[in-house]
Every structure is written in C-alpha cells, then in structure tokens.
C-alpha cells in the first residue's frame, strides 16, 4: 500500500506577476519539507519562471488534443518539456465558464497522463445541487467519467481535489465535518474498486481555505491537504497553510 503524502497546491487563476513569482518562490523555498508537496499553478506566461525558481509547478488546464490546428490551446507534451509536473483538470471555472463536460475533463486527464504529467482532478457540486442532496451523485459522476474512460488504475498517478462550487471564492467554507464526509465518500467509492489504490490516493480540499481554517480541515482523516485560491497569492498566508499541513498525513 502506497503511503499518502500531504500536498498544498496554489491556483493563481488569472493573477500574478514575475515579481510575485519571486516573492512566492523565496517564501516556499524556506518552508519546503519532505512531509509535504507544495505546488503552484500560475498562468501560462509565468510557468517557465516558476519552474526556474525551483518550485514544483503545474498548469491550470491543458488541451485534450494532440498538436494540431487548435488556436490558443497548449499541448500536454509542451507543458511536460517546459518542466511542469502537474495539471489541473475539471476546475469548476473551466466546467462552468468554458462548458467543459465530464467527458472533456476525462480526455484532458488522459492526455496529461499520456505524456507523464500528474493530473489533479477537480470535483464538486454547486450550491443548488448541495441543497438538493445531490453532492455524492455529482461527485461520483465526475469521477466515474475518468474511471469509465481509463479504468480505476489511472487514479493511481493522480490527485483528486474536492472543491464545493459554493465555497470557491465566496468566503463560505464547508465545515471540517462536511468536507471529511465527502472525502470519505470519494475514498470509499474508489476503495470499492481498488482498496490499496484508494488508501494511497491524495485527496485535497479546496474552497476558501485560509490560514485560519486550514489546520482543522487538514486534521480530518481523509483530507490530505488543500487546493488554495486567493490565499496562494499572499506569501504569509500560503506558507502558514503549508506549515499547517505538515505532519497531518
């Protein structure tokens, strides 16, 4: 059985600058630890600078296609050649704003793995879905799209991030107990197909995580770290969150 390792990932979305890359990399290099993986996901123009700074780096999306006539898209192989290690797939903003379906997300997941990138599969329900008791149904469908395309074994070389859409950038956060319940559902679902894989799978929580709530969230049995939005743009906040993840897995 593979041992899980805590991870704190920062999604900069369409924010950041070369100066912020320097500030954040200096801060992160001071808190690096064998206990946790720290990864930043800057916008594409900052990826090379982030990699050069020595911080583990990923991209916020990737094309599901191989190279060709796809203006504005970026191929997974090129991302790999730059030296990035991770890619986000299925973030709720990609699903809602750019209408990426579960099938498209699964195709992006597959393309990332094909070239040796580690996909972080983002899953989560909207506020109305949560209010109507559909959280598990929605999350299961998002995971099943990948399993049906690639088989459960593909999840071995991936990370899952549970981000309830109603908590992203809203200041609302799932309680530690709410988040743990969904994380346990995800792990149990995968364990029903492959127990060892499920126990070794890193599952992150995202949704208005900050230095004040991260410790309680990360203390939950099935929460292995966080996918951080706004707080990943502030060195003090992000490093405090990273420190709170040490020793929790």
UniProtKB/Swiss-Prot annotation:
GO biological process: gluconeogenesis; glyceraldehyde-3-phosphate biosynthetic process; glycerol catabolic process; glycolytic process
Keyword Cytoplasm (UniProt): yes
Single GO cellular component term: cytosol
Catalytic activity: D-glyceraldehyde 3-phosphate = dihydroxyacetone phosphate
Subcellular location: Cytoplasm
A GO MF label: triose-phosphate isomerase activity
Keyword Signal in record: no
Pfam families: TIM (PF00121)
Cited Gene3D superfamilies: Aldolase class I (3.20.20.70)
E.C. code: 5.3.1.1
Function: Involved in the gluconeogenesis. Catalyzes stereospecifically the conversion of dihydroxyacetone phosphate (DHAP) to D-glyceraldehyde-3-phosphate (G3P).
Record-given protein name: Triosephosphate isomerase
Organism: Pseudoalteromonas translucida (strain TAC 125)
Name of the gene: tpiA
